[in-house]
């Protein structure tokens, strides 16, 4: 079983696995691009989020910068989603957020279970 398979199964895994580190670094590059965009660039931000997150319910999504996550593809958000500044998701496991959800500033969601 690979370290990624262990991670996705909710088992203790090695966070310094080469494959996982490569994925983390690729996501960090996208997050850096997202956080560097103008807050007024709604189309640019939406485009990055569509490629980064596992599921977006509709285009009524706002995640204020800065935003941080580990993998992105483990995150699913519903329709009419809003997250305020400094939203952090360590998405080593699935994170599902439903419709009409508003998240305040400085909220963090952690799912990591690594050694």
Regions found by a protein language model. Give the residues of each.
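Short cysteine-rich loop/turn motifs with clustered Cys
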Residues: 59-61, 98
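Flexible, glycine/small-residue-enriched loop-and-beta-strand segment within the central core
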Residues: 53, 67-77, 82-115
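Terminal amphipathic alpha-helical/low-complexity segments used for targeting or macromolecular assembly
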Residues: 1-59
């Amino acid at each position: 079983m690979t370290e990624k398979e262990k991670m996705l199964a909710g088992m203790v895994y090695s966070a310094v696995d080469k494959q996982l580190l490569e994925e983390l670094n690729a996501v960090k590059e996208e997050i850096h691009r997202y956080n560097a965009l103008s807050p007024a660039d709604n189309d640019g931000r939406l485009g990055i989020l569509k490629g980064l997150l596992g599921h977006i319910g509709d285009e009524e999504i706002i995640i204020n910068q800065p935003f941080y996550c580990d993998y992105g593809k483990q995150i699913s958000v519903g329709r009419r989603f809003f997250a305020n500044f400094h939203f952090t998701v360590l998405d080593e496991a699935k994170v599902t957020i439903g419709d009409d959800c508003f998240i305040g500033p400085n909220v963090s969601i952690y799912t990591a279970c690594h050694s």
